[in-house]
């Protein structure tokens, strides 16, 4: 499998933009042609999820329907419309001796993707890797096995119709956990980068055991700070969206911090959440003012709920918010709601998370919303890829140096 992937990666590295875009269109057409089979396979996974009492957030990630599948197919076509990063000149300069140096984007090579109950990752990872000239080896979880297998069959058929090697997109055909171990070892040097998509335990194992570079985040644990200068209606709309639009994604807010000088002003934000069925866990000063609020424990500040539950705390201005976030944040995404630009500037300058937002929902922490077409994850590390991993983040670079006979003294 590893050697087939390396061979395919070599072919993709020199494939033209037209060839890659044609392959993506063939994949989209194949997915459309096999939609019924894909949805039937997904039903098998959903039945198994029900039998295994899978959590609601996991079931939501697992579920496919006609609308979600259509959106996935559309995202393949969006990737085809993106600029091809391969061959782009990132920077160029000429040295005093006449040497002309260019830094040029190149494919990474072979990407290993390890994921759980997220059949969409099968499509997202394959499309982005193909566009960036990379081969991909997919290892889906047992929860999404039937869905991922059906999607992979359609992907391979699309590749075959395009003329590109079908081994450019391979899937590990077993749910045996030993297969994960082999991928983490790099398949004898075949894999260049691993991207995990799944729960905290999966990502932690990958980061601990991988012998090749990893692009990943351990968990979401996103924060919103509401400053005393914030507009109430804006704060209410943003927090409702950030928590409840989709509770089971890594960009969902888990903790809201409120300026203690304006707590009463923003209590309607909390009552609006409760009216939508959200459980509030908060500090005593908030529980005293808002009915049916549970007292937050120390564990709540570091817990990723992925559910309609929210931790809320009052803080002493933006400095208090920064202090709390630095202590508990996973480095994923933080948002500030404020009209005072000096406060916003301080928030941005003192926090080091991968994504910082001003007056916007944390659920914009998504490659599609960034204009990347789609993403295969959010990276919170500081080396190479950071934030949404889109097509550009799946490239490396070379230095191309042109001379006219220069030799070094």
From Swiss-Prot:
Gene3D superfamilies: Aldehyde Dehydrogenase, Chain A, domain 1 (3.40.605.10), Aldehyde Dehydrogenase, Chain A, domain 2 (3.40.309.10). SUPFAM superfamilies: ALDH-like (SSF53720). Its EC number is 1.2.1.41. CDD domains: ALDH_F18-19_ProA-GPR. GO terms for biological process: L-proline biosynthetic process. Pathway: Amino-acid biosynthesis; L-proline biosynthesis; L-glutamate 5-semialdehyde from L-glutamate: step 2/2. Belongs to the gamma-glutamyl phosphate reductase family. HAMAP family: ProA. This is Gamma-glutamyl phosphate reductase. It comes from Bartonella tribocorum (strain CIP 105476 / IBS 506). The gene is proA.
């Amino acid at each position: 499998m590893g050697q087939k992937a390396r061979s395919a990666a070599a072919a993709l590295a020199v494939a033209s933009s037209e060839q890659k875009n044609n392959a993506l269109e063939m994949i989209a057409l194949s997915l459309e042609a096999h939609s019924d089979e894909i949805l039937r396979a997904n039903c098998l996974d959903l039945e198994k999820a029900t039998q295994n009492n899978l959590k609601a957030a996991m079931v939501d990630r697992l579920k496919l329907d006609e609308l979600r599948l259509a959106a996935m197919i559309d995202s393949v076509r969006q990737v085809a419309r993106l600029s091809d990063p391969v061959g782009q000149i990132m920077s160029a300069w000429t040295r005093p001796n006449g040497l002309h140096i260019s830094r040029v984007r190149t494919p990474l090579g072979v990407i290993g993707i390890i994921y759980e109950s997220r059949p969409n990752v099968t499509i997202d990872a394959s499309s982005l890797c193909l566009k960036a000239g990379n081969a991909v080896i997919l290892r889906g979880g047992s929860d999404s096995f039937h869905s991922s297998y059906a999607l992979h069959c359609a992907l391979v058929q699309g590749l075959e119709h395009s003329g590109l090697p079908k081994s450019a997109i391979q899937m590990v055909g077993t749910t045996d956990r030993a297969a994960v171990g082999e991928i983490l070892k790099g398949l004898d040097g075949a894999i260049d980068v691993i991207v995990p998509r799944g729960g905290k335990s999966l990502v932690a194992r990958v980061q601990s055991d991988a012998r090749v570079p990893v692009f990943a985040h351990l968990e979401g644990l996103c924060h919103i700070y509401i400053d005393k200068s914030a507009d109430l209606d804006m704060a209410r709309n943003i927090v409702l969206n950030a928590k409840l639009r989709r509770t089971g994604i890594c960009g969902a807010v888990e903790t809201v911090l409120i300026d203690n000088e304006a707590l009463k002003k923003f209590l309607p934000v909390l009552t609006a959440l409760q009216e939508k069925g959200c459980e509030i866990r908060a500090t005593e000063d908030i529980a005293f003012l808002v009915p049916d609020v549970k007292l937050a424990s120390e564990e709540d500040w570091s817990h990723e709920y992925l559910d309609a539950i929210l931790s809320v705390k009052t803080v002493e201005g933006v400095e208090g918010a920064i202090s709390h976030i630095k202590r508990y944040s996973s480095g994923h995404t933080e948002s500030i709601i404020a009209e005072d630009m000096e406060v916003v500037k301080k928030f941005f300058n003192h926090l080091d998370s991968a994504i910082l937002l001003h007056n916007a929902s944390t659920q914009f922490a998504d490659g599609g919303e960034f204009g990347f077409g789609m993403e295969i994850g959010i990276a919170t590390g500081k080396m190479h890829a950071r934030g949404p991993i889109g097509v550009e983040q799946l490239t490396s670079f070379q230095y191309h140096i042109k001379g006219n006979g220069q030799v070094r003294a």
